Amino acid sequence: MSLDASFPWIFSLMSVFLVSIISLIGLAVISMSEERLRRLVLILVSFSAGALLGDAFIHLLPEAAEESSFGMEMSGGILFGILIFFVLEKFVHWHHCGAAEIGECPKAFATTNLVGDGLHNLIDGMIIAGSYLVSVPLGIATTFAVIFHEIPQEIGDFGVLVHAGYTKARALKFNFLCASVAILGAVLVLLIGGQLPGLSQLLIPFTAGGFIYIAGSDLIPELQKETRLGRSAIQLAGFLLGLLVMAGLVFLA
């Protein structure tokens, strides 16, 4: 394997390992009061929504359009991404536990949430690796978007498990094991991508569709629940900052 050919492997595995480490963020919030945690998660969710939409519209879709015209194939890929994430949310009950739900998710949901989170992380690994197969800058931008989304997500997952009766150490362990499934997703795409050169071009619009769905269906509706002017302004600032960070990553190209 040449040095250039090894770049997607090196960067992909480093990135998914970093994403897996994010699952241990529960350590940083164990001592926080529930009210402070709610406020923090709402800010992180707003930033995450901006980052996901920014990656979709500033990085992924322009990259896909450069490789091929914006036709039915790309539109179909975007819609397929939206559909798959909708099905995961609908039938596997994977969803993004927001600030309003910390400490309120039913105990029966915890095990199902772990399964859904594992599938979610598998897809995260696949889309990160698929992005690196296209280019290193695109992979870095997608990794940042995934990380920004994972931070509030993992805090919510940690809260669900603790509320379900898991000890904090056990909750962190299961969160990390679920997050590590991203490594498997990345390896699968890297192995298959070597045999199917067009795979990465299919994953890019799929990823964009998934990011648009997550931001539009899960994150932004969560932000709309906040009606107080001051906190709404903070959320807007977080959302815009997420967009700006993604725009700034354009200069990596």
PLM regions and their residue ranges:
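Intrinsically disordered, metal-sensing/regulatory segments
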Residues: 1-253
